[in-house]
Amino acid sequence: MSKGRAEAAAGAAGILLRYLQEQNRPYSSQDVFGNLQREHGLGKAVVVKTLEQLAQQGKIKEKMYGKQKIYFADQDQFDMVSDADLQVLDGKIVALTAKVQSLQQSCRYMEAELKELSSALTTPEMQKEIQELKKECAGYRERLKNIKAATNHVTPEEKEQVYRERQKYCKEWRKRKRMATELSDAILEGYPKSKKQFFEEVGIETDEDYNVTLPDP
């Protein structure tokens, strides 16, 4: 037996007696060993032997529960609790239970919000996405301008293809604008300043800043 284990065994009676009195609930020797082994380094044989000795000395109570021995503090050492005191304790338990449930619900809400924010684009990613969309839109505007300027040289099939692509990209425009709006709204929920200040700080420019409106479908 190591020196630390020997010292723990020597003080086992005091440790176990104090533990049962503080917890004031029934335990098997296995429960006591599992709960105290890491903190005090008590071996299982020491725990079993010490509990039996404490029971024989009348310092704790022992009771058979099936094939297992259960140990608990002698209840005679505790003051009697009146019905009024029990009602007060019950009230505190109800209040604390409600508080715990409220805190758990708040934790679930914050975890869900954190998960949503973690999956959103970062500010640099949003800025990059916006620049790419601007570049893409500028290319389509230039292409459409050239097509309109050369109307007499466009076949009906080419014209139909262009308008189909226009509808496609307008739809994508709306989709991406909606996504960008939702992401910025999510960020603004925890942002201490106004939406306008946020856009100015990160360099976000909107369609409205340039009086650009989405074409009709």
Swiss-Prot record:
<keyword id="KW-0469">Meiosis</keyword>
<dbReference type="GO" id="GO:0005654">
    <property type="term" value="C:nucleoplasm"/>
</dbReference>
<dbReference type="GO" id="GO:0007131">
    <property type="term" value="P:reciprocal meiotic recombination"/>
</dbReference>
<dbReference type="Pfam" id="PF18517">
    <property type="entry name" value="LZ3wCH"/>
</dbReference>
<protein>
    <recommendedName>
        <fullName>Homologous-pairing protein 2 homolog</fullName>
    </recommendedName>
</protein>
<comment type="similarity">
    <text>Belongs to the HOP2 family.</text>
</comment>
<comment type="subunit">
    <text>Interacts with the DNA-binding domain of the nuclear receptors NR3C1/GR, ESR2/ER-beta, THRB and RXRA. Forms a stable heterodimer with MND1. Interacts with PSMC3/TBP1.</text>
</comment>
<dbReference type="GO" id="GO:0007129">
    <property type="term" value="P:homologous chromosome pairing at meiosis"/>
</dbReference>
<feature type="region of interest" description="DNA-binding">
    <location>
        <begin position="118"/>
        <end position="182"/>
    </location>
</feature>
<dbReference type="GO" id="GO:0003713">
    <property type="term" value="F:transcription coactivator activity"/>
</dbReference>
<dbReference type="InterPro" id="IPR040661">
    <property type="entry name" value="LZ3wCH"/>
</dbReference>
<keyword id="KW-0539">Nucleus</keyword>
<dbReference type="GO" id="GO:0120230">
    <property type="term" value="F:recombinase activator activity"/>
</dbReference>
<dbReference type="InterPro" id="IPR010776">
    <property type="entry name" value="Hop2_WH_dom"/>
</dbReference>
<keyword id="KW-0238">DNA-binding</keyword>
<dbReference type="Pfam" id="PF07106">
    <property type="entry name" value="TBPIP"/>
</dbReference>
<keyword id="KW-0597">Phosphoprotein</keyword>
<dbReference type="GO" id="GO:0003690">
    <property type="term" value="F:double-stranded DNA binding"/>
</dbReference>
<feature type="coiled-coil region">
    <location>
        <begin position="93"/>
        <end position="153"/>
    </location>
</feature>
<dbReference type="GO" id="GO:0010774">
    <property type="term" value="P:meiotic strand invasion involved in reciprocal meiotic recombination"/>
</dbReference>
<keyword id="KW-0175">Coiled coil</keyword>
<dbReference type="GO" id="GO:0000794">
    <property type="term" value="C:condensed nuclear chromosome"/>
</dbReference>
<keyword id="KW-0225">Disease variant</keyword>
<keyword id="KW-0233">DNA recombination</keyword>
<dbReference type="InterPro" id="IPR036388">
    <property type="entry name" value="WH-like_DNA-bd_sf"/>
</dbReference>
<comment type="function">
    <text>Plays an important role in meiotic recombination. Stimulates DMC1-mediated strand exchange required for pairing homologous chromosomes during meiosis. The complex PSMC3IP/MND1 binds DNA, stimulates the recombinase activity of DMC1 as well as DMC1 D-loop formation from double-strand DNA. This complex stabilizes presynaptic RAD51 and DMC1 filaments formed on single strand DNA to capture double-strand DNA. This complex stimulates both synaptic and presynaptic critical steps in RAD51 and DMC1-promoted homologous pairing.</text>
</comment>
<dbReference type="GO" id="GO:0000709">
    <property type="term" value="P:meiotic joint molecule formation"/>
</dbReference>
<dbReference type="GO" id="GO:0120231">
    <property type="term" value="C:DNA recombinase auxiliary factor complex"/>
</dbReference>
